[in-house]
């Protein structure tokens, strides 16, 4: 089995590594975390411009059609930099569920908005119970 990165994966790794190196030194990260938002909108916009928000999504919705290995590359570098922008909840969790289980209407309306950086999402799970306030 060959575990070497493809040429595209090497480019992705280099791009994300450069972003983290240039934008996430320890002091900068601490200032981001201490901010009112707890993350930086400018970084989120840059993720969109770099195509990082579209890595796992199908090309039919404007994504890059990446595989799990491509997401692993992004997440590994984000982990090294302790990146705090909501990539995991938006792109992987909520976006992943919409991608796998959403209707075509949901996919066509929500996924491009995630990829463009216009919206952020989170996963909400609830189960019916007498205390369920969402019923």
What kind of feature is each model-predicted range?
Residues 125-135:
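Single conserved hydrophobic/aromatic residue that forms the stacking wall/gate
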Residues 117-124:
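A short, Trp-centered hydrophobic/proline-enriched beta-strand micro-motif
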Residues 1-88, 109, 113:
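Amphipathic, small/basic residue-rich leader segments at the start of a protein or domain
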Residues 83-105, 131:
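N-terminal glycine-rich flavin-associated loop
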Residues 13, 20, 98-99, 130:
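Generic helix-packing signal
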Residues 32-34, 76-78, 99-103, 118, ...:
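A short linear-motif detector with a strong N-terminal bias
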């Amino acid at each position: 089995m060959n575990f070497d990165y493809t040429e595209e994966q090497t480019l992705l790794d280099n791009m994300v590594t450069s972003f983290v190196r240039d934008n996430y030194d320890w002091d900068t990260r601490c200032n981001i975390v201490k901010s009112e938002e707890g993350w930086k909108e400018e970084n989120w916009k840059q993720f969109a411009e770099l195509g990082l928000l579209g890595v796992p999504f199908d090309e039919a919705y404007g994504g890059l059609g990446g595989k799990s290995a491509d997401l692993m590359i992004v997440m590994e570098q984000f982990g090294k930099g302790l990146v705090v922008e909501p990539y995991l909840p938006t792109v992987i969790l909520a976006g992943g569920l919409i991608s796998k289980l959403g209707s075509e209407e949901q996919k066509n309306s929500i996924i491009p908005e995630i990829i463009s950086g216009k919206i952020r999402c989170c996963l909400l799970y609830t189960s019916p119970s007498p205390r369920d306030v969402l019923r």
